[in-house]
Amino acid sequence: MQDSSYKEQVTQAFDQSSSTYDRLGVEFFTPMGRPLVEISEPVTGERVLDIGCGRGACLFPAAEKVGPQGRVHGIDIAPGMIEEARKEAAERGLRNIALDVMDAETPELPARSFDLVMGSYSVIFLPDAVGALARYAGILDHGGRIAFTSPVFRAGTFPFLPPEFTPLIPQALLEHLPEQWRPEALVRRFNSWLERAEDLLRTLERCGYTSVAVTDEPVRMTALSSEAWVDWSHTQGMRLLWQNLPQAQRTELRARLVEGLDKLSDATGALAIDVPVRFVTARVAH
């Protein structure tokens, strides 16, 4: 699959899900965004770029940190995400936020115009993520920082999902995925620089960074019910699996997921699952 086709699929998936993204009774991206902002330590007056900002899981906490003297620029390739983030920014009365539809792989932004670049589960979706990281170094000012999150890739588990989900998704169903989204393709793309901390360290150093820190921490994902989680899964990256499945397989997968997740739920039917997340920070070398 060409990069242009891949990006079109990503854009369409997130654009179509923007109105319900990170909603529907499931908490994950927002609880992951807050600690990413905390470890990146934005301070009053700083200029922050949020790549793949979505509906603002990092954007709004960062805007609070930098205050009215600073600014936060959110970019996303999906117009619907930018529209939803603009609505919320207006509702919050925030004037230190700018939002633009932009390809985060090749951001059209001035050199040395930011103090901090952050991305929550967004860098990993870029076809040339390593090249993008090098370009971000160029738009960071002296002493600027980068902070991003990614899944913790482990052998034998379904990428992007907690290990508990691996036995719930039959391998045969994955054949319906676009080639670049099948687990083996994801492993080839990411494991070369993301799986091991030492590979990630070397990659970031080659891209122009220093003081690299890699920390794996669980982020608690909560859902009101198994059904709520399955509905929510249509609003994030897993949407690409759902929309490529024939109806019969869609029905089968939903039933398998609900049944399996019900076994993990508490007495009220609610779910709480710890998701392994990798937090990465670094400083630009120039």
Swiss-Prot record:
Record-listed E.C. numbers: 2.1.1.288
Keywords annotated in UniProt: Antibiotic biosynthesis, Methyltransferase, S-adenosyl-L-methionine, Transferase
Source organism superkingdom: Bacteria
Tagged with keyword Methyltransferase: yes
One GO MF term attached to the UniProt entry: methyltransferase activity
GO biological process per UniProt: antibiotic biosynthetic process; daunorubicin biosynthetic process; doxorubicin metabolic process; methylation
Pfam families listed in its UniProt record: Methyltransf_31
Keyword S-adenosyl-L-methionine: yes
Pathway: Antibiotic biosynthesis; daunorubicin biosynthesis; Antibiotic biosynthesis; carminomycin biosynthesis; Antibiotic biosynthesis; rhodomycin biosynthesis; Antibiotic biosynthesis; aclacinomycin biosynthesis
InterPro entries, sorted: Methyltranfer_dom (IPR025714), SAM-dependent_MTases_sf (IPR029063)
Catalytic activity from the UniProt record: aklanonate + S-adenosyl-L-methionine = methyl aklanonate + S-adenosyl-L-homocysteine
PANTHER family hit by this protein: TRANS-ACONITATE 2-METHYLTRANSFERASE, TRANS-ACONITATE 2-METHYLTRANSFERASE-RELATED
Assembly information from the UniProt record: Homodimer.
Homology family: Belongs to the methyltransferase superfamily. DnrC family.
Entry function: Involved in the biosynthesis of aklavinone which is an important precursor common to the formation of the clinically significant anthracyclines such as carminomycin, daunorubicin (daunomycin), rhodomycin, aclacinomycin T (aklavin) and aclacinomycin A (aclarubicin). These compounds are aromatic polyketide antibiotics that exhibit high cytotoxicity and are widely applied in the chemotherapy of a variety of cancers. Catalyzes the methyl esterification of aklanonic acid to yield aklanonic acid methyl ester.
Name of the protein described by the UniProt record: Aklanonic acid methyltransferase DnrC
